[in-house]
Amino acid sequence: MAKEDVIEMQGEVTENLPNATFRVKLENGHMVLGHISGKMRMHYIRILPGDKVTVQLTPYDLTKGRIVFRTK
């Protein structure tokens, strides 16, 4: 997947799920499943419900995404 093919959206984590997966509510109201990117795992960045995050979605499956940034 090329970097230009991703769609970046802002959202808020609503629920923790097993295996470092989260339910994220996007700005437009849609709910997606998000998993933590490898760099965030490597640097032990914790994500809790209520955190604002940036999610990358692919045009092929808009129901799942990768959490790439946690805003303060």
Curated annotation (Swiss-Prot):
Q: Where in the numbering of this chain does the S1-like domain appear?
A: 1-72
Name one matching Pfam family: eIF-1a
One GO cellular-component annotation of the UniProt record comes to: cytosol
Note the SUPFAM superfamilies from the entry.
Answer: Nucleic acid-binding proteins
Q: Does the keyword ATP-binding apply?
A: no
Q: Where in the cell is it found?
A: Cytoplasm
The cross-references to SMART domains, in alphabetical order and at most eight, read: S1
Any one GO MF term held by the record is: ribosome binding
Keywords attached to this Swiss-Prot or TrEMBL record, sorted alphabetically, are: Cytoplasm, Initiation factor, Protein biosynthesis, RNA-binding, rRNA-binding
Task: Please give the NCBIfam families that the UniProt record associates with this protein.
Answer: infA
Question: What's its job?
Answer: One of the essential components for the initiation of protein synthesis. Stabilizes the binding of IF-2 and IF-3 on the 30S subunit to which N-formylmethionyl-tRNA(fMet) subsequently binds. Helps modulate mRNA selection, yielding the 30S pre-initiation complex (PIC). Upon addition of the 50S ribosomal subunit IF-1, IF-2 and IF-3 are released leaving the mature 70S translation initiation complex.
Oligomeric and partner information: Component of the 30S ribosomal translation pre-initiation complex which assembles on the 30S ribosome in the order IF-2 and IF-3, IF-1 and N-formylmethionyl-tRNA(fMet); mRNA recruitment can occur at any time during PIC assembly.
Family that this chain belongs to? Belongs to the IF-1 family.
**What protein name is recorded for this chain?**
Translation initiation factor IF-1 2
- Tell me which species this is from: Azoarcus sp. (strain BH72)
